[in-house]
């Protein structure tokens, strides 16, 4: 990572802050430029930690499907071996393990009409993301202009369940105490504005905040089948993978 400090007088203040980014990195300095490089030892340790964390998430996801006696173990430095005797729907398991499932809640940027997003560039602080389950009249994924700043991260989700609301499959969710406070505060300040529920860089729902959501729970609605709602709830309950699996 290369960082250039704009003002020479800020270099002294920046130095200790940059060192705090990663104790396992080497910091080289030249004038107003700093180069932060991870050592091979640090990279190996991070890779091993990511594999171990991925194994734990994979095990939770498989356990939630009801499969018994799976074999899940690391193979080399960057592979995970998964053996599932008697699995009846291997494609579903592949889909579940192939999703990183990084979820967050963000505000929608309404500065550009949705119809213009296919030919527009996102303003600073926002990005254009495709819908996970909706298309426009040309058959293209519907686009959303979404703020980059995360309101509440998926790590604050405490539980998620597939259920039925007004005859449609939905996913109900509940935050932990910290997430509930953040979500309540943000929704209180943004009544009448749309917010996006983003999963793996795709918008799965973008409802309007009708009133403050202070109870720490809510519902994700979309064009879900019963099976899709069930699998989404499973992914949210079991947590996100630290890295994508291919």
How would you name each of these model-derived features?
Residues 22, 199, 214-246:
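Extended, hydrophilic extramembrane loops/domains of integral membrane proteins
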Residues 1-209, 214:
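Non-transmembrane, solvent-exposed regions of membrane trafficking/translocation machinery
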């Amino acid at each position: 990572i290369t960082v250039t400090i704009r003002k020479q007088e800020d270099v002294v203040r920046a130095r200790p802050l940059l060192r705090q980014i990663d104790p396992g990195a080497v910091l080289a300095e030249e004038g107003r430029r700093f180069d932060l490089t991870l050592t091979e030892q640090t990279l190996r340790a991070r890779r091993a930690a990511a594999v171990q964390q991925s194994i734990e998430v994979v095990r939770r996801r498989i356990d939630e499907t009801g499969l018994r006696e799976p074999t899940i173990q690391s193979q080399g430095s960057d592979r995970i071996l998964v053996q599932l005797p008697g699995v009846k729907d291997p494609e579903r398991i592949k889909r579940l393990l192939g999703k990183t499932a990084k979820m967050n809640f963000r505000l929608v940027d309404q500065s550009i009409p949705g119809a213009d997003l296919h030919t527009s560039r996102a303003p600073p602080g926002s990005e254009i993301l495709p819908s996970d389950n909706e298309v426009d009249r040309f058959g293209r994924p519907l686009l959303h202009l979404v703020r980059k700043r995360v309101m509440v991260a998926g790590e604050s989700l405490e539980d998620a369940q597939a259920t039925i609301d007004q005859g449609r499959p939905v996913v109900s969710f509940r935050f932990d105490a910290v997430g509930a406070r953040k979500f309540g505060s943000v929704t209180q300040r943004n009544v009448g504005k749309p917010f996006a529920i983003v999963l793996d860089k795709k918008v799965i729902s973008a409802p309007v905040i009708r009133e403050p959501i202070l109870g720490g729970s809510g519902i994700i609605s979309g064009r879900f089948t019963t099976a899709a709602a069930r699998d989404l709830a499973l992914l949210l309950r079991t947590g996100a993978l630290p890295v994508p699996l291919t």
